[in-house]
Amino acid sequence: MAPVMRLGSAALRSSIHLTSRQTAFTAARCYSSKTQTLKERFAELLPENIEKIKALRKEHGSKVVDKVTLDQVYGGARGIKCLVWEGSVLDAEEGIRFRGKTIPECQELLPKAPGGKEPLPEGLFWLLLTGEVPSEQQVRDLSAEWAARSDVPKFIEELIDRCPSDLHPMAQLSLAVTALEHTSSFARAYAKGINKKEYWGYTFEDSMDLIAKLPTIAARIYQNVFKGGKVAAVQKDKDYSFNFANQLGFGDNKDFVELLRLYLTIHTDHEGGNVSAHTTHLVGSALSSPFLSVAAGLNGLAGPLHGLANQEVLNWLTEMKKVIGDDLSDEAITKYLWDTLNAGRVVPGYGHAVLRKTDPRYSAQRKFAQEHLPEDPMFQLVSQVYKIAPKVLTEHGKTKNPYPNVDAHSGVLLQHYGLTEANYYTVLFGVSRAIGVLPQLIIDRAVGAPIERPKSYSTDKWIEICKKL
């Protein structure tokens, strides 16, 4: 990481200068102007966080923090400790922590919609960016700001409408997000020549705009490809998840809205080394705008080894249901699991690159299902697989983690409420993941993170190096 800089008061004032969009929003909002905005709070915390990094590097900058084996080099850099990611840390035994807080703690502490039980993703965005749990008022304000920024440019609507209906929804989402580069305040400011200390303020503006517009873009893709209907207007007094659910056509189903709040919250962030998070960071390190950076991350998320896993789980469960019918006995499930493994296939939704216990994101979804759809046949099947699969996988002996991950459950929940188009599920994931990766992109620009540039060698060079060791 490049040396970080101290931001003076003038730079901070410049970074939080209101754009015309913000000015209009501030004038229109009906809540107290005394409430500190997210941008103001981040700016206030920034000097202390910069000093923390400077002190860490000054005292420990020359220390060796990891050892790398050749297997790791050839194994996808698995487990190499070389990235800075402030929002979350993944522990193999207890799962993800968002700014030090577990998923159950986030479910308890983060503000909720009136009458709701699940946390609002707006609150998690605030937590990821600042490290602080926001107040209910701060979350309401953030909901209102995202709603105020949600209008999608006409040329983006026309671009989506002209896509072939059989073009994969993720390709359409990436296309639309890339095209939003045309609206980038960061790109315009950079082209004019701005001080590096101002980068983060423009990155923040683009990030807020992108997050605000994603549900409407995603819903337009859904309506065009699957429903042929119109996208409902954003209701300015409603939260982010309600508006997304309503634009998808599920706004009247309170349980689905609650599910979407949970889904968007728990899929946001999972450390910085996964493909979508790392790609966003990598592209952003070249000073590409948040639009181009997130579009690149979405392309990574679209890969079958990353964001398509819940589709594979759902397909596998559907195949199992056809074979075993209503027989959910231990014997029937065990036989099907062994048939899958003996055929050289994996059990989708089980195992994880880091985790060695049940994914707490799975547990959160299971708890939701137990409360809202305990009699659903597919949930009952998922529950039986959860009961039996770890034992079978352990006996099989070829996995380090025989427990379910987040993908083992989400498809069944979405199917229950009528969102049955499995090849759209990654779009939901993408909307959520943007909320998780953009806080780090803002932080990167605020602390002066450099362009990423690791060293590479050919196999012949590695042979030469290893012979000398």
UniProtKB/Swiss-Prot annotation:
One of its GO terms (biological process) is carbohydrate metabolic process. Its EC number is 2.3.3.16. This is Citrate synthase, mitochondrial. It comes from Neurospora crassa (strain ATCC 24698 / 74-OR23-1A / CBS 708.71 / DSM 1257 / FGSC 987). It comes from the Eukaryota. Signal peptide: none annotated. The active site is at residue 352. It is an enzyme of class 2 (transferase).
